[in-house]
């Protein structure tokens, strides 16, 4: 909105010329989201505590100390992330850009599904929430619409192509299967972040790191000069997603202020499903879906641990891990929560560097 207001004045007042630069608006978006989080956070947490007298329902079969340490902590803090990201994005992006709206659809749509899930968990006082089938159908519909939208904005042959990291000029044509592929990327990213969100600060920092990587990727592939130099597939218009990712980073940092151990609020499915959807949407738009699996490798491993646990238990009646997802396995082994969280952050940072390396190694 501010971009649209300032752009016509850029010729008369040189300060307004700053609004033309994605880098300036990205920094402003990050700071705006951070400030919004700080301003809204305390009041939102007080309100959530007042309406959620028992806090987030805790799994009875989970680590025993969760029943003692985390009981009574309110959930649905993802509302704060969505509000800060949404306000900042609307203020600082070029609202004529279709990629921004497609990614916002995924973010807010998946956040809405998570909100309904959290609400049902609280109202029924159990950990079930929305039926799994209903949740997946909702995610599939929103993901499919967003993927088709993004495909319609992208030039051929990129619109339906899958780029392979490390290999230049290699584009696998998916054709009419691309919307289904994009849908699966969005759903997979969303649910992977959701599974990772089990300890204070565990999911939000890897999300911030991934958003930082994709802010850079969006800037590079949206810029003809940089995309040509690095031999990346140029996707005109995706530079605006740098502003969105920056807003996401600011909102994530603001949320971490309140989610740092011991957490005053949990993001709930409202936040985790939305964050994963946002990352998936940016990856689809920038044609870096496989790089997302590298940068978000922690989320991938957490998801695989659940799949392996369920599959092996159904086949043999035995468990591979003491408890899934993987972070609970280490809890059961006696690792302190802070140790697990910080080590997982370090792994995320290393994976982010690996993902960034694919941009140069060709």
UniProtKB/Swiss-Prot annotation:
Keywords: Cell cycle, Cell division, Cell inner membrane, Cell membrane, Cell shape, Cell wall biogenesis/degradation, Magnesium, Membrane, Metal-binding, Peptidoglycan synthesis, Transferase, Transmembrane, Transmembrane helix. Pathway: Cell wall biogenesis; peptidoglycan biosynthesis. The keyword Isomerase does not apply. It is a multi-pass membrane protein. It is found in: Cell inner membrane. GO terms for molecular function: metal ion binding; phospho-N-acetylmuramoyl-pentapeptide-transferase activity; UDP-N-acetylmuramoyl-L-alanyl-D-glutamyl-meso-2,6-diaminopimelyl-D-alanyl-D-alanine:undecaprenyl-phosphate transferase activity. GO terms for cellular component: plasma membrane. It catalyses: UDP-N-acetyl-alpha-D-muramoyl-L-alanyl-gamma-D-glutamyl-meso-2,6-diaminopimeloyl-D-alanyl-D-alanine + di-trans,octa-cis-undecaprenyl phosphate = di-trans,octa-cis-undecaprenyl diphospho-N-acetyl-alpha-D-muramoyl-L-alanyl-D-glutamyl-meso-2,6-diaminopimeloyl-D-alanyl-D-alanine + UMP. Its EC number is 2.7.8.13. It is an enzyme of class 2 (transferase). GO terms for biological process: cell division; cell wall organization; peptidoglycan biosynthetic process; regulation of cell shape. Its cofactor is Mg(2+). It comes from the Bacteria. Catalyzes the initial step of the lipid cycle reactions in the biosynthesis of the cell wall peptidoglycan: transfers peptidoglycan precursor phospho-MurNAc-pentapeptide from UDP-MurNAc-pentapeptide onto the lipid carrier undecaprenyl phosphate, yielding undecaprenyl-pyrophosphoryl-MurNAc-pentapeptide, known as lipid I. HAMAP family: MraY (MF_00038). This is Phospho-N-acetylmuramoyl-pentapeptide-transferase. It comes from Granulibacter bethesdensis (strain ATCC BAA-1260 / CGDNIH1). The gene is mraY.
């Amino acid at each position: 909105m501010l971009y649209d207001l300032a752009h016509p004045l850029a010729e008369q007042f040189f300060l307004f010329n700053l609004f033309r630069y994605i880098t300036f608006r990205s920094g402003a978006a990050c700071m705006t989201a951070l400030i919004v989080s700080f301003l809204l956070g305390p009041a939102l947490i007080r309100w959530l505590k007042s309406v959620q007298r028992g806090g987030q329902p805790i799994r009875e079969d989970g680590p025993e100390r969760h029943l003692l340490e985390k009981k009574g902590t309110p959930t649905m803090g993802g509302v704060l992330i969505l509000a800060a990201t949404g306000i900042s994005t609307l203020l600082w992006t070029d609202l004529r850009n279709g990629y921004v709206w497609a990614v916002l659809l995924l973010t807010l749509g998946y956040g809405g599904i998570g909100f309904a899930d959290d609400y049902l968990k609280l109202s029924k006082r159990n950990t079930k929430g929305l039926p799994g089938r209903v949740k997946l159908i909702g995610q599939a519909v929103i993901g499919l619409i967003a993927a088709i939208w993004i495909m319609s904005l992208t030039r051929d042959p990129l619109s339906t192509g899958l780029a392979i990291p490390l290999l230049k000029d290699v584009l696998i044509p998916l054709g009419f299967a691309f919307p289904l592929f994009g849908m699966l990327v969005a759903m997979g990213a969303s649910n992977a972040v959701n599974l990772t969100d089990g300890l204070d600060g565990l999911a939000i920092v890897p999300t911030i790191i991934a958003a930082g990587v994709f802010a850079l990727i969006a800037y590079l592939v949206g810029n003809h000069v940089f995309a040509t130099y690095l031999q990346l597939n140029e996707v005109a218009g995706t530079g605006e997603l740098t502003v969105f990712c920056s807003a996401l980073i600011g909102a994530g940092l603001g949320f971490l202020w309140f989610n740092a151990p011991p957490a005053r609020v949990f993001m709930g499915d409202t936040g985790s499903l939305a964050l994963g959807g946002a990352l998936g949407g940016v990856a689809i738009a920038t044609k870096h879906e496989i790089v997302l699996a590298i940068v978000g490798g922690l989320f991938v491993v957490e998801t695989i641990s659940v799949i392996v646990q369920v599959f092996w238990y159904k086949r043999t009646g035995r468990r591979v891990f003491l408890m899934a997802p993987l972070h609970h396995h280490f809890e059961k082994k006696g690792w302190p929560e802070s140790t697990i969280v910080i080590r997982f952050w370090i792994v995320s940072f290393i994976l982010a560097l690996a993902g960034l390396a694919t941009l140069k190694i060709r």
